[in-house]
Amino acid sequence: MKTYSYETSGALFKRAAEVIPCGIYGHYSPVTCVPISHYPFFTARAQGSKFWDVDGNEFIDYMCAYGPMVLGYAHPAVDEAYQAQMKLADSVTGASARMVELAEYLVDLIPVADWAFFAKNGADVTNFAVMIARVATGRRKVIGIKGGYHGTSPWMMSAGHHGAIDDDFTHVIRIRWNDYDGLERAITENPGDVAAFIATPYHHPTFADSEMPADGYWQKVEQLLRKNGIVLIIDDVRCGFRLDMRGSNEYFGFKPDLICLCKAMANGYPISALVGTETLKTDAGRVFYTGSYWHSAGPMAAALACLKELKRIDAPKVMLEKGKKLLDGMVAIAKNHGYHLKATGAPSMPYLRTTDDESLMFHQQLCGECTRRGAYFTSHHNWFLSTAHTGEDIQRTWDILDDAFKAMKK
């Protein structure tokens, strides 16, 4: 099977490194792509489930732009809604009617939502959620999960991150995932001072298996927080609309106070949302929180179109089924070659690794071999399925994985 080379991408990265810190920053940085020689750095175009790099190589994309692509790149209904709004107005003096329409739609769609607020990135709304909780309770402390990720605001980081100081997370308490006793202990040790508990619906760290909630975990957590007047914040930025259109909490059967949404909300257009209960609406209004482009109407129109299409086709069900089919086949292929692939998390956004080498070096090489054959995988982060991935894509991916295992044996 043909393998790709990346001469144009490499040359462009050298230019980028001259004028941009690290060449490419953040989660697109090449440091996450190991072996680095097996990955492209720059994309030229995208359509459906695929993208093409600047060297003309075609990839079935299982990262989906790290989550925002959910219906397929360049989806006509979403793009047309965006373009129609852009012909009218986007960032202008005054809010758009699209903002009201989108808020109404989310309130109708999500059972716990009585109101909605819009921003751009996931961190915008996780940060806002914590601010609301502190205003509502008059307390300082926030409990989070060790290894949990809620963006790059200083309070969200942990010790050792460049640019953050100890004071930034003085009031953040970290506990282990699924550790109900640890949560109860943290509340007891900080009487009357815990404002919020923030967590993802299930635990999806990097470089480690995803973990589902234990039976009854969320129901017990919800009851404990209600008893102690603590705000329950669900960071649904990554899982949102991939497990349940009504919020991932509905998938697991509990009711948070605030839900943070972003990635799959608008099929790649820049928008995030915080939705919450009536009891927190007044406190949300007391916090002055804004951004230069947070009222942009184009992404709001795109989000409306995206959410309606996701609901129409029952996208969570579609993606879960596609993911299960993909993973079952991959596990079987690995077994045929004498290896063991372990899939964790939801099939619509799984984390995969080979258990034959705990160092991850073998798995990194395997993902790289698949990528340079046309199935874009990362080894450190969960993948994403979209409704655009086809049966043909899945079969092609199986063929690529089979060839990659053969190459690893040579």
Question: Which role fits each region the language model picked out?
Answer:
Residues 1-410:
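Conserved N-terminal phosphate-binding loop of PLP-dependent enzymes in the Aspartate aminotransferase
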